[in-house]
């Protein structure tokens, strides 16, 4: 009652960990205390074409490729050092964090702070899917600033440009609510893609990850598909 009177309670939406196999939510406490397994997943570094800049791309890394149709924005750290870089002998220009350029053996053209990327808009290969188009409702994919308290950006892992899907990730959802950007719903309780998502509709996102890679390959937007070894929470009920 006191919390209500102080205006501390509200009705809204949130993201919770969910086991698609047994159809149950998993509490944060269970994730913190129950089993983790070391697993290897195929991640993806996707190329997003920057609007108004010929042959210029954002390099964005994600360990959850199934969420890419839900991409709404890309986050950068305004104060960290980013670069414009390219592969030797090639014309494509990429934006990414400085440390990642060295790891990917790219030639650095120039460096600058992340804030110079803010406001750039880009296209996603999933934009023509009916459900995506409806959810975005004219919103242009944009480079946004991270919130270090919600989503800190690493200089040692990934590309420094973070895929933001407010309908799928907890930190993404928090940042999306703060910035009032759209949410794209992708899957049901059994991890099956909803209707109006083109060839993905009816497919299980967790059992058939290759459908995303095949789609990206046809769109010619894959920069790399690195294997990623990490500790991953598992459902104790399964």
Residue ranges, per PLM feature:
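Residue patterns forming the tRNA-binding/recognition surfaces of aminoacyl-tRNA synthetases
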Residues: 1-69, 132, 154-238
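Catalytic alpha/beta core of large soluble enzyme barrels
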Residues: 70-72, 76, 80-188
């Amino acid at each position: 009652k006191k919390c209500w009177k102080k205006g501390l309670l509200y009705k809204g939406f949130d993201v919770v960990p969910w086991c698609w196999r047994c159809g149950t939510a998993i509490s944060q406490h269970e994730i913190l205390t129950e089993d983790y397994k070391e697993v290897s997943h195929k991640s993806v570094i996707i190329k997003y074409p920057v609007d108004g800049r010929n042959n210029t791309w954002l390099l964005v890394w994600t360990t959850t490729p199934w969420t890419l149709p839900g991409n709404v924005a890309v986050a950068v750290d305004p104060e960290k050092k980013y670069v414009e870089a390219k592969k030797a002998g090639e014309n494509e220009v990429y934006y990414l964090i400085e440390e990642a350029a060295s790891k990917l053996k790219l030639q650095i053209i120039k460096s600058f702070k992340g804030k110079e990327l803010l406001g750039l808009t880009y296209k996603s290969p999933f934009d023509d899917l009916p459900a995506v188009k409806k959810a975005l409702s004219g919103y242009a994919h944009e480079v946004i600033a991270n919130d270090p308290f919600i989503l800190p950006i690493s200089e040692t892992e990934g590309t420094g440009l973070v895929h933001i899907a407010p309908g799928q990730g907890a930190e993404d959802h928090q940042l999306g609510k703060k910035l009032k950007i759209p949410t794209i719903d992708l899957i049901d309780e059994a991890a099956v893609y909803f209707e109006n998502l083109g060839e993905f509709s009816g497919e299980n996102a967790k059992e058939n990850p290759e459908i995303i890679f095949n789609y990206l390959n046809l769109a010619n937007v894959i920069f790399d598909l690195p294997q990623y070894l990490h500790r991953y929470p598992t459902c104790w009920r399964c």
